[in-house]
A protein has these predicted regions:
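Surface-exposed binding patches on compact interaction domains or structured appendages
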Residues: 46, 50-80
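Bacterial Sec-dependent N-terminal signal peptides
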Residues: 13-37, 114
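Short, surface-exposed loop/turn segments at beta-strand-coil junctions that are enriched for proline
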Residues: 84-90
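A short beta-strand micro-motif common to beta-rich folds, especially ectodomain repeats
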Residues: 90-102
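Short, solvent-exposed loop/linker segments at the N-terminal edge
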Residues: 38-43
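Extracellular and select intracellular beta-sandwich modules with Ser/Thr-enriched
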Residues: 102-108
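Sec-dependent bacterial lipoprotein signal peptides
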Residues: 1-17
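Interdomain boundary/hinge segments at the C-termini of tandem beta-sandwich modules
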Residues: 109-113
Length: 114
């Protein structure tokens, strides 16, 4: 009986260690349709960027005058960014960073002075 038990145990261990755990994982993809928006009118407006991805993504933004319609998503999507009017007497610029599992894309936005 002990031999049968050991044989079964050995067979199970052999099968468990012989499994192929090297399943192919798709490469993470993150692309944007446009990454630079220069000299946006001082009255503000809206810009759109197409995001192409096969993963979840997030957006980091530190400018209160540049407002994305979403800060996270998954897969392909259209991002609309509202640019508020610039009433200051200086041009301004900011970067929005879109990240997906360690891959980053930067959207550079500059706006004319008021």
């Amino acid at each position: 009986m002990k031999i049968v038990y050991n044989t079964i145990l050995f067979t199970l261990l052999f099968l468990a260690t012989s499994c192929d755990h090297s399943e192919k994982i798709d490469d993470i993809k993150l692309e944007i349709s446009q990454n630079i928006f220069r000299n946006i009118d001082n009255n503000g407006g809206k810009i759109t960027v197409a995001i192409t991805s096969n993963s979840e993504w997030i957006i980091a933004n530190s400018a209160d005058w540049c407002i994305p319609d979403k800060y996270q998503g998954e897969g392909n999507d259209i991002l609309t960014i509202k640019i508020l009017a610039n009433t200051k007497h200086a041009n301004r610029q900011t970067n929005l960073i879109i990240s997906a599992q360690g891959i980053n894309q930067t959207i550079k936005i500059s706006q004319q002075k008021g």
